[in-house]
């Protein structure tokens, strides 16, 4: 599979480079520093006409706020939480207090209008990102599945808007290195990036850092205009090879005389993640007689492999190797009237995708795991007169092979009505999805009782298939009222109020990581029956545990937006209040006791209420940005059969976040050193709970960052620091084999570098 991916990439690149650029399309020089107009095929309304909260970043913002990946947007965007833990595979996303640690995300990711189908690709390094828009709240009407609470739409740099050469090299703490270079000439653009880090976390067992990482990314882009048709081909490829998973065992205190504490990272088996990702997308915009037709087509290939010491201790208990070979195809058509009426405009579209994922996820049980997880459990159910159960093997493999297919088809429409100061939006999407899974799990062992002289061979298998079909209706209604008077407009002041009601959903799926527990139960029952002992229960998990349903929500919002441009001052502020009601919320749960897997389960009902705001002020060289989010997300009805968590806080998302950044640029009258810029920022994360019961909590903490930049005629020099106060905090919590683990945040770190652009 790796060979096929590399071959495809090389052939595509060869074709890309071989394209003629003799008929060069006219290009518009872009400064890359000011606000830029989006080229998204779905943006019928401007940013100021949207009746939903939108946060926009340009290329200048990415450098100033040290935004190098989607994870760096957390906290800056109100209500958005993307904790940095595990590896690049663990792209957990929470928005407005609701999200999930695994499987389908609550916000969609679009890169140049191409939907990124698999969440394993959500954690990537920004390379020549020209603009990013984060739409908050359900975006199901236009974007469909997995956009239940928002969409991150990213646009990369194109030779259609900028011509030139860019490059940068930076070096920092933990021997971290990043270098990137790009050229945009004629119809063709090309960019490449490499990064390396020795890591920040030491594994006490090996004495080496466990989170060493290397990453490579490539992008090639070709644009062409033929008559009234624009063609845009974007090919990207990336390779990731990293360690990670610096999880620390939590030793709980007695709550009175002894406080709990974290042990160092200390595990004996390999934990790593490798990923090869290739995505080729073609955008075509055609101006026909009466309509504008846009087409977006993509082919997405993913091969990744994860090795995991699943007990994360020095004991030899059990390990997981999960590999995926995935291919997906997407197609979308969008139609808009070529000439809209004064009072009405619209857009309509159809979307479809198909995906196949071949997954192998064998779990290897080692000596300590066989004894503690299988034999001790089995012998507790065997009468003493039978003796003790023994297994011949020092280790054995529970194989799990999956063939998973998904498809989705949808049709949607949005209309925009203008009546005086009112702008009304009404939309509807019909969305259908089908999921299929074939599974084959098995294990072979030899066992005997202590009183027996010979071992008995035993084979356990668990084969079958599952399928699910869903149909979702996703309506949206919104209103925007322009309260600006003529006198306000003359003074450069704009005031708008907005309200919306919308529905969103994220897909259901299959729990592939629970099959080792199911097969353990199958083995237990099979061995016991051979001994004439019959258990009353098949165990905590069974076939019903392999499927989970889609999560849906209805969102109600009220807000306002203020802007002022006068006497060199530029002020923009917004505030939004929301109420979100969710059904079948997807929650990550762990089997009771010493289970080895994890699975997604549907909670009954939940809700989230909150207020979020943003403000930005510019005056001469001074810039101030701030954002705030206050949210209360709770279970309305959730009983897992042992405990009733109704009324408790939803875990993993803080109750509030506050972000502020101030910077000043000193312009110098010199042809050598043109300006000096300095900035500082602070992020406060509020209290969060780590589990459904709420007895484990993360206290509020503050992170401080800053940077200093010297801009010369042809290049910039910069130094930057993050977590300057050296704050100690946790980013993640989970349980394995009955033990609790945390990951702590990265320590104080610095970096410096040089960038060029000409």
Per-segment meaning from a language model:
Residues 20-61:
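Short, acidic, small-residue-rich periplasmic hinge/interaction motif at the N-terminus
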Residues 71-114:
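Extracytoplasmic beta-strand/coil segments of soluble accessory domains associated
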Residues 73, 92-97, 110, 134, ...:
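N-terminal periplasmic accessory domains that precede
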Residues 112-136:
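Short acidic/polar hinge/loop motifs at secondary-structure boundaries
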Residues 161-162, 170, 182-269, 302-315, ...:
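Periplasmic-side early beta-strands and strand-to-turn transitions of outer-membrane beta-barrels
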Residues 181, 185, 283, 287, ...:
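Membrane-embedded beta-barrel scaffold of Gram-negative outer-membrane proteins
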Residues 343-347, 418-424, 432, 567-582, ...:
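Gram-negative outer-membrane beta-barrel transporters
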Residues 505, 620, 682-691, 709-758:
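C-terminal beta-signal and adjacent terminal beta-strands/loops
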């Amino acid at each position: 599979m790796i060979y096929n991916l590399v071959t495809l990439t090389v052939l595509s690149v060869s074709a890309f480079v071989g394209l003629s650029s003799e008929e060069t399309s006219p290009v518009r020089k872009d400064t890359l520093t000011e606000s830029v107009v989006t080229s998204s095929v779905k943006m019928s309304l401007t940013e100021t006409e949207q009746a939903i909260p939108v946060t926009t970043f340009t290329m200048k913002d990415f450098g100033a706020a040290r935004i190098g990946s989607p994870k760096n947007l957390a906290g800056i965007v109100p209500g958005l939480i993307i904790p940095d833990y595990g590896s690049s595979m663990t792209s957990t996303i929470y928005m407005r207090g609701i999200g999930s640690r695994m499987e389908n995300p609550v916000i969609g990711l679009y890169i140049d209008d191409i939907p990124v189908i698999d969440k394993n690709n959500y954690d990537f390094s920004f390379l020549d990102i020209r603009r990013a828009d984060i739409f908050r709240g359900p975006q199901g009407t236009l974007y469909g599945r997995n956009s239940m609470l928002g969409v991150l739409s990213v646009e990369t740099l194109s030779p259609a808007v900028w011509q030139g050469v860019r490059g940068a090299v930076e070096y920092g703490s933990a021997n971290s290195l990043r270098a990137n270079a790009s050229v945009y000439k004629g119809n063709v653009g090309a960019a490449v990036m490499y990064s390396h880090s020795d890591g920040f976390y030491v594994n006490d067992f090996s004495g080496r850092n466990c989170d060493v990482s290397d990453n490579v990314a490539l992008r090639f882009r070709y644009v062409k205009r033929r008559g009234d048709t624009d063609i845009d081909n974007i090919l990207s490829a990336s390779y990731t090879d990293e360690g990670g998973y610096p999880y620390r065992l939590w030793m709980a205190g007695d709550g009175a005389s002894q406080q709990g504490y974290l042990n160092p990272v200390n595990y004996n088996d390999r934990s790593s993640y490798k990923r090869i990702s290739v995505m080729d997308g073609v955008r075509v915009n055609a101006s026909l007689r009466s309509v504008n037709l846009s087409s977006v087509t993509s082919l997405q290939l993913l091969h990744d492999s994860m090795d995991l010491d699943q007990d994360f201790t020095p004991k030899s208990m059990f390990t997981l190797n999960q590999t995926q070979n995935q291919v997906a195809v997407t197609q979308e058509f969008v139609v808009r009237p070529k000439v809209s009426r004064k009072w009405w405009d619209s857009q309509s579209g159809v979307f479809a995708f198909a995906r196949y994922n071949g997954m192998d996820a064998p779990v290897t049980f080692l000596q300590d795991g066989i004894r503690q997880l299988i034999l001790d459990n089995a012998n507790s159910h065997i009468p003493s007169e039978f003796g003790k159960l023994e297994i011949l093997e020092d280790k054995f493999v529970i194989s799990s092979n999956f063939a998973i297919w998904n498809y989705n088809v949808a049709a949607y429409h949005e209309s925009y009505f203008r009546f005086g100061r009112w702008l009304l939006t009404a939309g509807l999407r019909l969305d259908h999805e089908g999921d299929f899974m074939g599974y084959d799990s098995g294990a072979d062992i030899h066992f005997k009782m202590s009183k027996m002289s010979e071992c008995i061979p035993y084979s356990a298998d668990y084969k079958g298939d599952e399928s699910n079909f869903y149909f979702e209706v996703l309506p949206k209604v919104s209103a925007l009222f322009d309260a600006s008077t003529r006198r306000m407009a003359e003074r450069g002041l704009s005031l708008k109020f907005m309200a919306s009601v919308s529905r969103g959903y994220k897909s259901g799926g299959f729990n592939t990581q629970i099959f080792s527990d199911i097969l353990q139960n199958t083995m237990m029952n099979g061995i016991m029956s051979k001994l004439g002992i019959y258990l009353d229960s098949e165990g905590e998990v069974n076939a019903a545990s392999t499927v989970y349903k889609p999560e849906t929500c209805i969102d109600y919002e009220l807000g306002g937006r203020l802007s002022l441009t006068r006497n060199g001052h530029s002020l923009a502020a917004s505030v939004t209040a929301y109420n979100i009601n969710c059904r079948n919320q997807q929650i990550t749960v762990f089997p009771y006791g010493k289970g080895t897997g994890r699975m997604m389960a549907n909670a009954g009902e939940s809700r989230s209420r909150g207020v979020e705001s943003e403000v930005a002020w510019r005056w001469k060289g001074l810039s101030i940005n701030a954002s705030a989010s206050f949210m209360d997300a709770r279970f309305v009805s959730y009983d897992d059969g042992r405990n009733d968590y109704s009324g408790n806080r939803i875990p993993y998302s803080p109750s509030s976040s506050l972000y502020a950044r101030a910077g000043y640029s000193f312009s110098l009258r010199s042809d050598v050193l043109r300006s000096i810029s300095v900035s500082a920022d602070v992020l406060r994360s509020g209290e969060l709970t780590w589990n459904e019961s709420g007895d484990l909590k993360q206290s509020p903490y503050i992170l401080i960052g800053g940077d200093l930049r010297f801009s010369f005629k042809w290049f910039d020099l910069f130094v930057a620091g993050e977590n300057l106060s050296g704050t100690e905090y946790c980013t993640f919590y989970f349980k394995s084999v009955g033990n609790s683990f945390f990951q702590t945040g990265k320590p104080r770190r610095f970096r410096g570098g040089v960038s060029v652009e000409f």
